């Protein structure tokens, strides 16, 4: 069990079923010290309004010893790497994940998908690329991993991709993990929970990492401090309330 989970959705994304309070309760039971709520960006049909993300600034930082990061799973919109997060949203958020979602950016050919993903990585606006192993979006894995390492952007291994969605992701995710290993980049593990009961579950992710001998020191979820150091290296101001996590 790793004490950090970086990808989960609440009832604000209406195809998910848990509240912030539900996640806090599960985190306490499971020994999760720090987690990020990352509801879908507003260009998705059932996503929250952009005011939802701006108003996350009112959330407490720590509840019952559990740290809460304010995040978003934004949508990659085009080959220029634009995402549906901007302006005051950035000011309120700690963690920006971005990925391909069919209602916003339909699958294209390998070159176009790769260009869109690398442009997003190079934009400086994103910390993590979500589920890059999605088989519906063929990419140049080596080029993406090298760009991610260069720009200090983590590539996600998404536990839900092996259980509930994006069927057939295993081979691609092994390739992603191996390419990140070779490029000296970062991997982020995400449960992609749409119900609090699955938060912190990374069993399938770890099978992927074990298969390619991925180094423990390049996994962001190993400790709250490792993740916070990564975010601070990308410009996030230190959060005093997290000092004792």
Swiss-Prot record:
| Residue sites binding Zn(2+) 3 per the record | 73, 101, 131
Q: How is the cofactor bound?
A: Binds 3 Zn(2+) ions per subunit.
The domain of life is: Bacteria
What Gene3D superfamilies does the entry give? Metal-dependent hydrolases
The EC number(s) given in the record are 3.1.3.-
Among the GO biological process terms of this entry, one is: bacterial-type flagellum-dependent swarming motility
State any GO CC term. Answer: cytosol
| Single GO molecular function | phosphatase activity
Positions that bind Zn(2+) 2: 15, 40, 194
Which cofactor does the UniProt annotation name?
Answer: Zn(2+)
Query: Broadest EC class?
Result: hydrolase
Task: List the SMART domains.
Answer: POLIIIAc
SUPFAM superfamilies referenced in this protein's UniProt entry, alphabetically: PHP domain-like
Q: Where does Zn(2+) 1 bind?
A: 7, 9, 73, 192
Keyword annotations from UniProtKB, A to Z: Hydrolase, Metal-binding, Zinc
Subunit architecture: Homotrimer.
Q: Which HAMAP family match?
A: YcdX_phosphat
Report the family membership: Belongs to the PHP family.
Q: Please identify the protein, giving its name as recorded.
A: Probable phosphatase YcdX
